[in-house]
Amino acid sequence: MMMRDGNISGPKKKKFTTKCRPFSFYKNRHIIMLINDESVYLYNLTLKPPSYYISSIVGQFYKQDNSTKNAQQLVLVSSTTLQLFEINEEAGKLELQSSQNLLGIINSIEKICLSEVDGVVITSDSGNLSILQYDNKTKKFISKIQEPMTKNGWGRNYVGENLAIDPENRCILVAAMEKNKLFYKIESNSSGSKELSSPLEAHSKQVLCLKIVALNTDHNNPLFGALELTPEKKCIINYYELDQGLNHVVKKKPNSSNSDPLPNDVNYLIPLPGHIGGMVVCGTNWCFYDKLDGPRIYLPLPRRNGQTQDSIIVNHVTHVLKKKKFFILLQNALGDLFKLTVDYDFDKEIIKNISITYFDTIPPALSLNIFKNGFLFANVLNNDKLLYQFEKLGDDLTEGELVINSSDYESLNSVRESVTSFKLKGLDNLALIDVLETLSPITDSKIIDSKLVTLSSHSYVKSITHGVPTTTLVESPLPITPTDIFTTKLSLESANDEYLVISSSLSSKTLVLSIGEVVEDVEDSEFVLDQPTIAVQQVGIASVVQIYSNGIKHVRTVNGNKKTTDWFPPAGITITHATTNNQQVLIALSNLSVVYFEIDATDDQLIEYQDRLEIATTITAMAIQENISEKSPFAIIGCSDETIQVVSLQEHNCLEIKSLQALSANSSSLKMLKSSGKETHVHIGMENGVYARIKIDTINGNLSNSRVKYIGSKPVSLSVIKFSNEIEGILAISSAPWISYLYRDSFKITPLLEIDITNGSSFISEDIGGEGIVGIKDNNLIIFSVGKEDSVFDPSQDLTIATTKLRYTPRKMITNGNRLFISESEYNVQGPFKCNINGDVKENVDEDYYEAFGYEWKQNSWASCIQVVDSKSNQVIQSLQLDGNESIVSMSAVSFNKTSTPSVPASHLVVGVCTNQTILPNSYDKSYLYTFKIGKKHLQLVHKTELDHIPQVLENFQDKLLVASGNHIRLYDIGQKQLLKKSTTIIDFSTNINKIIPQTNRIIICDSHKSSIVFAKFDESQNQFVPFADDVMKRQITSIMNLDIDTLIGGDKFGNIFVTRIDEDISKQADDDWTILKTQDGILNSCPYKLQNLIEFHIGDIITSFNLGCLNLAGTESVIYTGLQGTIGLLIPLVSKSEVELLFNLQLYMQQSQNNLVGKDHLKLRSYYNPIKNVIDGDLLERFLEFDISLKIEISRKLNKSVNDIEKKLIDLRNRSAF
């Protein structure tokens, strides 16, 4: 794949294309496919699913094995993904149990009781009402019920907009925003499983349904409360009752005593538990309790002391205690939590009082969930999700704290006139214990040194790196230069490693250290210390063997005394390699012989097998299965002829070669490991830096199903490490250390970050809290653990996120050498910082306070700044706060009278701002261009230029500043006091230019309304841009990038990705025969020539950025895209015809075989707005890896391929550019 940057011109234009023969037909089992050599074929993969979770629910979705407690789990659902988490109470962490791409767009989700466990009810764009249940065997949700409700897609009459389930699981209500409401009764069939009856309709004409909640009726008919809007724009409350006896729906209105008109600022409904019933209706600074046959009870909502912000409830969670007691936590839009309690008279069945108190302040959330074991999960809006633990319930109020009682208020007017305020405080009742890192929303991204740097999560720069963090525990120098390191325990029953053995082949020495509270020399080890050690192993019950160059030292502990036995090779022969486990020892001699020993279980004696194996070539590595209770049936021997041999160690054919496997290079290290009690794999480190994994049949020793990964330029060294009691893996060290392990039937290989070692070994000690790794680098000993400090290793996470806090919502990021220039603007916010663009200003701002409680809200106000971040240290090195009520709308780095290249960064930074800007309706007072000089350390203001238009787009074009606004494009050059206008162009058929890509002598214009994409060339004779080609399809572009000088990839606001290209002949004519081309007349108020559409694909998220690059070592350059909801995806170019044909046909069979959990047709999903074209959906194809073996074989036979061939192709595709 060859690509050229749009800023580079030349005589030859290379295309972003696949190398296929022209117009070939391929026929396989009645499947015909057309491939064109001018087409682009891409393979889509989702690397990180959306992390904007629209809802979260807590329930008992599966029962834990051997657990008497009814543990609860957490379900998080984004627009396309369903994830299940479990709380590890000992570590206080959320652990991911399952993550599924539903291949549909989720609208809402609720919990439903399915006999012994809970399930989830989902409404989606498929038009089905879906009920899913978690299968603990497959660790996935499976479909139980698919009930068609309406047609596919969205609309005002889509009944899945609102979802409510009766608390006693008797019926489900789904309601459209307009008119339609459907009631499904939940019934049990003869087998005891749940099923849905035919729906009962309850249509409400001429009203809009804003919100519906299910009410508790204490075994009476199911009842639902609805907030609706009349044609007169008045809010009303209606009740809908399902009469189970007559099997129809009755619409009821509040009784006459509750018929007071509702204020139009009503926004939220909260149902109360069963013995009380009814609901709390909330509005701006007020709420009241309403019940169908009871009086209303009014209360004001607390407001922050000394601030003018209103208190608007946006979220709540109800928690029921023992003896029918309960409390409700209300959260307003600022994040303040209020505790609502009800004083209920059970004898008279009336409410005596409702009280509200201030509880705590946490970030504003979309949903809150309380676990029975005392945890609170906050599904935070546009930021990391937070897990809290209850320290107390807020009952011990001190004197002076706010308590609001309903008995003090009689009417809604008295409540609305009342102002009750409280004083903010730090967390008192809650304690933060875990953070679930998310990326939503992503507004921009760049690839820097194989890291994806994003502007995300409200106000952060987040650098995403493929790798697992490490924590260094001990680092100390050694008296020798080590070349190898080993750890061992002294007895079989010992849980901890007790000896640390360091070997040096350079100085022919061995150092034995004891492991405990301190690391010190061992004087009585009985080891040979004047020769380098090859292996150390605890064998039998209480023995240790040391294998060194000239023999084997066997140290036995008998009645507390150490006894030694020596074994020596023949004279002049040395030991070159060794591999051991608790019962077996295998060594290789310099005369190419292999000697095998076993341990006598009765007295720990070392018994030599009488025969020896003679190898024809030099042995480079060897391995037997480690850390097992039984004997290893085979040994693996690597030879210098680039092969590995499988040698039997079984009694009937001991030391017999069973099979052989050719490699791409000599093996430098070998390990054999049984993965999670299932398959056994041979792990191979090669001298060319390739790490391979091959499955071995433990019955006959056959090798199959190989997987390879390039991990560095140096020979690969392997060692077995233990991450936890359940997970063992491999430490692979080349140019950098990597770890590989099997987790939930998925094999992961991930680099270790922030550590540099040349050799390592597993290390278990209570003094470091469990499992760790001890390594060597130069003359230093390093002990470290895998995972972040004070946290356990999470095998489900192979991405590390480094964060840098910003002030406001980041909008755009520009790279300049090692610095990032970031523009930030936030609406309806009053910033506490003073303007300092003309120089430093002394100020004392408590940033911790604003981090906890947020900035003060102010209507139609803006807070904006520019921050400079060092991309290496992730530190903010300069902050420039803008003056007054200014908002940043655009920013660009410009080289005035100087060519900008990657080695010569731009000289100036230009920022476009508006004053007093408002949104809906859109307006502004004045607009300016700030010009800053980019210095070696800081930005320095040069001058300020006033404009008569909003600077919507700024770009660098031919050493001038290009400014686009509306349908005008202007060029500016730098002056002494302001920027000087040099050119003006009006694009008649454009309306609102929002993106421009500059090239050498032409630009690519994007319009968010009418003309979509336009190619224009700068005509020096006319001193303006002349458009000559545009897109045939009108799109609302959100992001765009050059693939080559003629090819573009873009995304629109509806979640579609497309690739378009200008015809090669037209592009050449624009360069060579411009005089003729520019005189061509346009067609129907557009350009004379049209672009070719090459790719169409629906992602389901609004694309905010594209980057060319890769996220792994020596990977293929691909397109990496980010979505607003936190999606990170990859588009890999497919480079051969056979590959395209295989994947295309596999996709067809997968579409036929795949059972979608929400009932969405895959072709309709990926063709939401335009038919899918030339993109293979890797998210669908990777489900092949999860199929049972019978279905895999059925599909593979249709494709004339083996199952292993298909699996290997899918894994190799992912490894090309990602992980």
Curated annotation (Swiss-Prot):
Compartment(s) of residence: Nucleus
Example of a GO cellular component annotation carried by this entry: spliceosomal complex
Pfam families in the cross-refs: Beta-prop_RSE1_1st, Beta-prop_RSE1_2nd, CPSF_A
Keywords assigned by UniProt, alphabetized: mRNA processing, mRNA splicing, Nucleus, Spliceosome
Xref: Gene3D superfamilies: YVTN repeat-like/Quinoprotein amine dehydrogenase (2.130.10.10)
Gene Ontology process terms (BP): mRNA splicing, via spliceosome
Domain of life: Eukaryota
Gene Ontology terms, MF aspect: U2 snRNA binding
Chief location category: nucleus
Keyword Iron: no
Keyword presence, Transmembrane helix: no
Record text on subunit structure and interactions: Associated with the spliceosome.
Function statement: Involved in pre-mRNA splicing and cell cycle control.
PANTHER family according to UniProt: DNA REPAIR/RNA PROCESSING CPSF FAMILY
Protein family per UniProt: Belongs to the RSE1 family.
Name this polypeptide is given: Pre-mRNA-splicing factor RSE1
Organism: Candida albicans (strain SC5314 / ATCC MYA-2876)
